[in-house]
């Protein structure tokens, strides 16, 4: 990724509303959890990668990922942001918009090739389970990044207990040593869980 003067930059075509620095788009950590992750904890492997992004919304973060990736499969189920996502995909040929519910990955299975990176950004009670269902697309050794909004999972348990619960679920599903990464500096109440998919570990279960 491209960094200049502490700014994360993106080399793609400038879109309306983008801030620009030295002719490149500024990837704002306050507007994108992926950018926040890069600023606080390091870069995920996005360059020339095949990425599946769950919860793409109107495609702001997806557009930045597409500047670096080979292809981004962008799943969104809300009609209004999907319209913006489709317009974006017309201008960026390596974005494939999928108007689907990420809880049912079998519905878009024919359209998604194996990916190097799976990003889950859906704030629902079953957000960890949604990530696990979509592991069918992730290559051996591929990376999973799950953005957790813990309040969306209910208030009946402590934050720490929720995180332990999610980590245990991911490990049981084949994610190796998931790291819990705080994003509060830019996104209050959000946590990232980042791990690597190991089929052999899954089989051991």
From Swiss-Prot:
Assigned EC number: 2.1.1.-
Enzyme class: transferase
Keyword Hydrolase annotated: no
One Pfam family named in its UniProt record: Fibrillarin
Matches recorded under InterPro entries: Fibrillarin (IPR000692), SAM-dependent_MTases_sf (IPR029063)
GO molecular function: histone H2AQ104 methyltransferase activity; RNA binding; rRNA methyltransferase activity
Quaternary organization: Interacts with nop5. Component of box C/D small ribonucleoprotein (sRNP) particles that contain rpl7ae, FlpA and nop5, plus a guide RNA.
Name of the molecule in the record: Fibrillarin-like rRNA/tRNA 2'-O-methyltransferase
